[in-house]
């Protein structure tokens, strides 16, 4: 049997994608719409306090295209806290006009393929902790996609020897390093949590960088032979100060 790679796990993660039922929302009297928007804004701002307390974070983006209108991404120390956030959100009046189009449940993950042997507790390493319990960027653009490692009769990632997987992941990682300073990447593990094995969330102020890195990765053996992908979601940052404009109808 092949050796399983160890992982380091951080905050639990929930990506929520919603379409807005604009046709029905338009029928709501203006004063009621305004009250709903303010209630939603209060909800977002209340949950944002976790960032200052270093007990989680969030991202809010307006998704481009017909897959969704809004992405809310929450990170929390406990999975049950994500349930509480989602339940509270669903009970807001404005949620009656939100149609959930997709969601993704996972946990911030660092692969341990390239880690050397050490007696150090990695969870006490400041660099590691900053990646497991991150403060999310507030860049102009976001990209999210789920992915699997292929396992079929011809190419099965999980049957490769550990040393070969280490080599492939090293080469894969070297491509990503070329985008340091241009893209901030977060990998979340979802084996046993959702329909894919990982979620990939990218942040950048230049949306074209998403296309460049994904295209370049296509020529990497790890991706070309063993990568399988779900849908891609691209969005522009949505600030609570812009809610009035966003929800104006």
Swiss-Prot record:
It catalyses: Fe-coproporphyrin III + 2 H2O2 + 2 H(+) = heme b + 2 CO2 + 4 H2O; Fe-coproporphyrin III + H2O2 + H(+) = harderoheme III + CO2 + 2 H2O; harderoheme III + H2O2 + H(+) = heme b + CO2 + 2 H2O. Its cofactor is Fe-coproporphyrin III. Fe-coproporphyrin III binds at residues 131, 145-149, 172, 185. The active site is at residue 145. Gene3D superfamilies: Apc35880, domain 1 (3.30.70.1030). It comes from the Bacteria. Keywords: Heme, Heme biosynthesis, Iron, Metal-binding, Oxidoreductase. One of its GO terms (biological process) is heme B biosynthetic process. GO terms for molecular function: heme binding; metal ion binding; oxidoreductase activity, acting on the CH-CH group of donors, oxygen as acceptor; peroxidase activity. Fe-coproporphyrin III acts both as a substrate and a redox cofactor. Its EC number is 1.3.98.5. InterPro entries: CHDC, ChdC/CLD, Dimeric_a/b-barrel. Pathway: Porphyrin-containing compound metabolism; protoheme biosynthesis. Belongs to the ChdC family. Type 1 subfamily. NCBIfam families: PRK12276.1 (NF008913). This is Coproheme decarboxylase.
């Amino acid at each position: 049997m092949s050796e399983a790679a160890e992982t380091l796990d951080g905050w639990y993660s929930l990506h929520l994608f919603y379409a807005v039922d604009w046709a029905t929302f338009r029928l709501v009297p203006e004063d009621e719409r305004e009250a709903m928007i303010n209630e939603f804004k209060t909800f977002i701002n209340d949950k944002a306090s976790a960032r200052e307390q270093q007990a989680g974070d969030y991202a809010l983006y307006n998704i481009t295209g017909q897959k969704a209108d809004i992405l809310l991404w929450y990170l929390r120390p406990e999975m049950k806290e994500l349930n509480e956030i989602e339940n509270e959100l669903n009970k807001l009046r404005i949620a009656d006009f939100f149609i959930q189009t997709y969601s993704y449940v996972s946990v911030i993950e660092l692969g341990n393929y390239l880690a050397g042997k050490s007696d150090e507790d990695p969870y006490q390493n400041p660099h590691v902790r900053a990646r497991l319990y991150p403060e999310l960027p507030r860049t102009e653009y976001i990209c999210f996609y789920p992915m699997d490692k292929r396992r079929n009769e011809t190419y099965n990632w999980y049957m490769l020897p550990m040393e070969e997987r280490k080599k492939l992941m090293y080469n894969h990682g070297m491509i990503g390093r070329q985008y340091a300073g241009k893209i901030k990447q977060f990998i979340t593990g979802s084996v046993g949590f959702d329909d894919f094995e990982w979620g990939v969330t990218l942040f950048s102020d230049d949306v074209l960088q998403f296309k460049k890195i994904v295209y370049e990765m296509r020529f990497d053996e790890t991706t070309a032979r063993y990568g399988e992908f779900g849908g891609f979601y691209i969005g522009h940052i949505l600030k609570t100060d812009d809610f009035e404009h966003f929800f104006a109808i």
